[in-house]
Amino acid sequence: MTKKSTKAPAKKAAPAAKAAPAAKRGAAADSGKVAKTQLVEMVADQTGLTKKQSEEAISSMLECVVSALQSGKSVGLPGLGTLSVKETAARTGVRPGTSEKIQIPAGKKVAFKVASTLKGNL
């Protein structure tokens, strides 16, 4: 009679820890940035509107701001500042890595001027 060798059962691999959704939100909060979803929740809490109504209001406001900027208008946000479109001049730049001089064409950019009331409160 032959003796069967007894092997120890194989160890099961430890299950991989899943990142909790709350941990992801916490990481965004730690970065100092407020996401649109967080802004929607804040508006809903302060106004008593539903999250859906708050999201629609914020989206509509952002669309209006973008539309005004695209048409060349300035947008004043009381207590926050003013968004405006500024022309940028053509200029000579240097390509990183090759140090080659390149011509950067004229264009437009969005500028933001902080309200003095906000500056004083920071």
Swiss-Prot record:
Q: Which PANTHER family match?
A: DNA-BINDING PROTEIN HU, DNA-BINDING PROTEIN HU-BETA
Q: Provide a Gene Ontology MF annotation, just one.
A: DNA binding
Q: Where is the composition biased (Basic residues)?
A: 1-10
Provide the protein name: DNA-binding protein HU
Q: What UniProt keywords apply to this chain's record, in alphabetical order?
A: DNA condensation, DNA-binding
What role is this protein assigned?
Histone-like DNA-binding protein which is capable of wrapping DNA to stabilize it, and thus to prevent its denaturation under extreme environmental conditions.
Gene Ontology BP terms: chromosome condensation
The source's domain of life comes to: Bacteria
The similarity comment for this entry is:
Belongs to the bacterial histone-like protein family.
The UniProt annotation puts the region (Disordered) at 1-32
Disulfide bridges in this chain: none
Name the species this protein comes from: Deinococcus radiodurans (strain ATCC 13939 / DSM 20539 / JCM 16871 / CCUG 27074 / LMG 4051 / NBRC 15346 / NCIMB 9279 / VKM B-1422 / R1)
Q: Which Gene3D superfamilies match?
A: IHF-like DNA-binding proteins
Cited Pfam families = Bac_DNA_binding (PF00216)
Give an example GO cellular component term for this record. cytosol
> Record keywords: Oxidoreductase included?
no
Residue ranges, compositional bias (Low complexity):
11-29
